[in-house]
Amino acid sequence: MLRKLFLFLMAVIGTVAMDAQALAPISWTAYGLTFDAPKGILVEEDTEDTFLLNSSRFYISLQSLDSEDMVQEDLNELLKGLADDDGVQEQSPIESFDLKQFHGIWLKGKAEEDPCYYACLMTKDAGSVFYISIIYNRTDDKVVEKMLKSFKMEEEM
């Protein structure tokens, strides 16, 4: 009996662990912007201004921002302002990261009771800036960081 209980618990833990990391590429068609998102997440909106995704564990929002005359040094102030405007509490210091096509920054915090990441990505040619918010529950920060580090843009032909 104890052996069956142990095997059942291991199967449940294994399923939860695999589910937490089950990511698949998804694209915002207006910009050819692709990133890894949780498998099965629903696209609520896919317009030129906004890309919204939703599941029982994640709410992901992407927006294209007016980037005219914006430089990489402007991103920290921009991100902090967006998080403050949305009432994000317990904000972490801003961290930067670098991708093949983007300069990126993020901060962690709480949106009401749920953990969240707020991020900005600027293309390395300084042509586009994207704002990303990911509100989530029942997952590991590493999954969210993996999503943020997976962004890429279709190369122009």
Where do the protein language model's features map onto the residues?
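Short, well-ordered beta-strand elements
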Residues: L62-Q63, G127-Y136
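Sec/Tat signal peptide C-region and signal peptidase I cleavage site
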Residues: V16-A22
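Secretory pathway targeting signatures of secreted, lumenal, and periplasmic proteins
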Residues: Y31-N76, K110, D114
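Short, hydrophobic/aromatic-rich segments at coil-to-beta transitions
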Residues: A22-I26, D49-T50, L99-K108
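Sec-dependent N-terminal signal peptides
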Residues: K4-G14
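Short, surface-exposed coil-to-beta transition loops
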Residues: D46-E48, E113-C120, Y131, V143-K146
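Signature of long, low-cysteine stretches enriched in small and polar/charged residues
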Residues: L79-A126
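Surface-exposed amphipathic alpha-helical segments
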Residues: Q21, G32, P38-L42, A83, ...
